[in-house]
Regions:
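Acidic/histidine-rich, surface-exposed loop or edge segments in extracytoplasmic proteins
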Residues: 1-14, 77
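Solvent-exposed loop/turn segments at secondary-structure junctions
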Residues: 48-49, 79-81, 109-110, 158-159
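Acidic/His/Gly-enriched intrinsically disordered linker/tail segments
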Residues: 89-93, 106-216
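Auxiliary, metal-adjacent structural segments of Zn-dependent hydrolase domains
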Residues: 17-73
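Residue-level preference for long, well-ordered alpha-helices that form the structural scaffold
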Residues: 13-17, 153
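Amphipathic alpha-helical segments that form well-ordered structural scaffolds
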Residues: 23-27, 99, 160, 192
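Active-site scaffold of zinc-dependent metalloenzymes
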Residues: 53-92, 99-106
């Protein structure tokens, strides 16, 4: 296990993956335009050690997670392919994905909707190309953490964020995000979404969730 400390977007000290981490941070900041974040990355070597940090037995597809608002647990690049179902080349996108979560928690200061945080992370990390099988899930029922556990709408969330950006522009999405509370309620989100996009999220999200990958 190795620990890497980042303060105000800068990696402190030496590490074999220092440049990769700095590149990942810059990719996240570049998308949002501004912001400074401070956090730690714990590079894990074994599945047993990773599961211990998570607090349960983990699946082999799980390769990184963020806890609190300032710690990322991630399999070390040298063992990434050996201990997970992911190719070594996806170490970087997984790193970016988790840094997006740090940014949304620390700088944007919102947790709900979960589908929004996950969709953003996928889009910014350019992980949509890694989605092997698109799974239709109702993102209107993926707002709270407990809903997400029953309805982990990863691929639908990613494609919906991508759709919003391409159809309406990134500025509208940023306007929505910057107006969110930390624990945004569903009703409040629906109102804010309609103010920005002039359409009901329940309607738009539901319709989008029912489409197949070929219809998106």
């Amino acid at each position: 296990m190795e620990r890497l400390i980042i303060k105000n977007n800068k990696v402190i000290g030496k590490h074999k993956d220092k440049r990769i981490v700095e590149k990942a941070i810059n990719q996240v900041i570049s998308f949002f335009g501004k912001g400074k974040i401070s956090f730690q990355i714990i590079f894990v070597k074994t599945r047993k050690e990773y599961s211990k940090f998570v607090g349960r037995k983990t699946n082999k597809w799980e390769a990184g997670f963020t806890t609190g608002n300032d710690i990322i647990y991630l399999f070390d690049k040298d063992v990434f392919e050996k201990v997970s179902t992911h190719k070594k080349q996806y170490f970087y996108s997984t790193l970016v994905h988790e840094i997006v979560h740090i940014y949304t928690y620390q700088y944007l200061w919102f947790i709900n909707p979960i589908w929004l945080t996950e969709g953003l992370a996928y889009v910014i990390a350019k992980q949509m190309r890694e989605i092997k099988k698109y799974k239709k899930r109702d993102i209107t029922k993926a707002h709270y953490e407990e809903e997400w556990f029953d309805n982990p709408a990863y691929s639908t969330s990613a494609y919906f964020i991508d759709y919003l950006i391409k159809k309406y522009g990134k500025k509208k999405l940023m306007d929505l995000i910057h107006n969110l509370e930390e624990f945004e309620k569903k009703d409040a989100f629906e109102k804010k979404f309609k103010e920005v996009y002039n359409v009901s999220f329940k309607k738009l999200g539901k319709n989008f969730s029912e489409k197949s990958i070929n219809q998106i």
